[in-house]
Amino acid sequence: MARTKQTARKNVGGKAPRKHIGQKSARKTASTTAGMKKPHRYRPGTVALREIRRYQKSTELLIRKLPFQRLVREIAQEFKGDLRFQSSAVLALQEAAEAYLVSLFEDTNLCAIHAKRVTIMPKDMQLARRIRGERS
């Protein structure tokens, strides 16, 4: 298709400008808000991509240690009361849990992309677990 030169066109028709009744009060409010600068906002998705790159580079644990430790103790309490854990054992459990979750989210994202979506949904996670053989 051939390119065509675009020329400026004058706007024909439309509504005639109206006289404002409260022009003085409008001018006052405009001058006070003109000094205020709008906060800077990134486009949707920019911050998400930056966070993805940041977390892919890093190796630190993403779940806080104490809440995870409380969760482990709460679950262990159901099986046997008065259990004690070495700190290295809790750390090993946390490493394994985070590795599993990251892997599951990667597979879930692939399922969403396969469905021509960019948003993951519960059905993507169910499909990923079903393919892995974790859930029938």
Swiss-Prot record:
Top-level lineage group: Eukaryota
SUPFAM superfamilies linked: Histone-fold (SSF47113)
Gene3D superfamilies (UniProt xref): Histone, subunit A
Post-translational modification N6-methylated lysine, affected residues: K10, K28, K37
Biased amino acid composition, Basic residues: 16-27
One family name in Pfam for this protein: Histone
Stretch list, region Disordered: 1-43
Alphabetized InterPro entries for the sequence: Histone-fold, Histone_H2A/H2B/H3, Histone_H3/CENP-A
GO molecular function, one term: structural constituent of chromatin
Nucleus found in the keyword field: yes
Modification sites for N6-acetyllysine: K15, K24
Compartment list: Nucleus; Chromosome
Entry's Gene Ontology cellular component terms: nucleosome; nucleus
Keywords linked to the UniProt accession: Acetylation, Chromosome, DNA-binding, Methylation, Nucleosome core, Nucleus
Similarity remark: Belongs to the histone H3 family.
Complex formation: The nucleosome is a histone octamer containing two molecules each of H2A, H2B, H3 and H4 assembled in one H3-H4 heterotetramer and two H2A-H2B heterodimers. The octamer wraps approximately 147 bp of DNA.
Purpose: Core component of nucleosome. Nucleosomes wrap and compact DNA into chromatin, limiting DNA accessibility to the cellular machineries which require DNA as a template. Histones thereby play a central role in transcription regulation, DNA repair, DNA replication and chromosomal stability. DNA accessibility is regulated via a complex set of post-translational modifications of histones, also called histone code, and nucleosome remodeling.
PANTHER family in UniProt: HISTONE H3
Protein name as catalogued: Histone H3
